[in-house]
Design a protein with these regions (language model features):
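Gly/Ser/Thr/Pro-rich low-complexity, intrinsically disordered segments
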Residues: 1-266
Length: 266
């Protein structure tokens, strides 16, 4: 089996899988707590680590159910901002063209891209609706940053073509919003290195104290040239080494339908 390392660093749970690993989206399509879906998926696919997936909204009936009840919402009431591509070829979710995805081909090659995850790119599995942290070695963050002063440089939006060689950080509005939240906010994400090692990092909501920039930079510190954040706050959960390191909030467990599983291969 590919070597797996776990450590706790500055309130961050860090799992690194060296060597081959398989991306397995976790999808709930019934009416049960998502933690039950995760545990069943983990047992069936022998997943090494599991975290939550993309941002999502709820239908009006889903909001009412979540507000007044303590039972799981029907999966149809959850409106995921992004797609999950299963190994069967099934595609679940909704369009989120401004978000990013992480995907994998059958030969274990990893990819990250912007836009909707689709079936026609040759991907075997994937998960969309994610926030970019670093893409092809370029940091994403709150505002465009450049290596030197440039006249008329754009601080947000698409940099001028002549300025792109000097770009050291690319603005992303979702990232900017997340970076302005309290440092105790839950955070989770997945990244990969040029040699296809996988890094999963998570901070429990209300417990940690790590800024969003530090969270991003920890992926880079561990060699990732591509990494994305999942839905944060009390949506974040982490399953590893036989159980949950921490769980999402009760109302999120009742409404979540997408997660990410990674299996270290033999």
């Amino acid at each position: 089996m590919s070597p797996v390392e776990y450590k706790k660093e500055n309130d961050l749970h860090i799992i690194k899988i060296t060597g081959k690993s398989r991306l397995t989206p976790i999808v709930r399509d019934g009416e049960e707590l998502f933690s039950a879906t995760v545990q069943r998926a983990q047992s069936k696919a022998k997943l090494t680590v599991c975290i939550n997936g993309c941002w999502y909204g709820l239908t009006d009936s889903g909001k009412a159910d979540a507000f007044v009840g303590h039972d799981p919402d029907p999966s149809a009431d959850t409106l995921n901002e992004g797609f999950a591509l299963l190994g069967t070829g099934a595609l679940h979710g909704h369009s989120a063209p401004n978000m990013f995805y992480i995907a994998q081909k059958l030969d274990y090659t990893w990819f990250m891209g912007q836009g909707d995850l689709t079936k026609n790119r040759g991907y075997y599995t994937g998960i969309g609706g994610l926030c970019p942290l670093v893409f092809k070695g370029l940091k994403y963050g709150d505002g465009n940053l450049y290596s030197k002063e440039l006249p008329n440089a754009k601080l947000t939006g698409e940099p001028l073509p002549a300025h792109k060689p000097f770009l050291t950080q690319r603005n992303n509005n979702r990232y900017a919003a997340l970076s302005r939240l309290d440092n105790r906010t839950g955070r989770g994400g997945i990244g990969f290195t040029p040699t296809a090692d996988i890094v999963v990092i998570a901070q429990e909501h209300g417990v940690g104290s790590v800024s969003f920039d530090t969270f991003r930079d920890t992926f880079i510190k561990h060699g990732c040239t591509n990494a994305c954040a999942v839905d944060g706050s009390d949506s974040v959960f982490l399953w590893y080494d036989g159980g949950f390191k921490f769980m999402s909030a009760e109302n999120k467990d009742e409404t979540q339908t997408f997660g990410i599983g990674i299996r270290a291969e033999t």
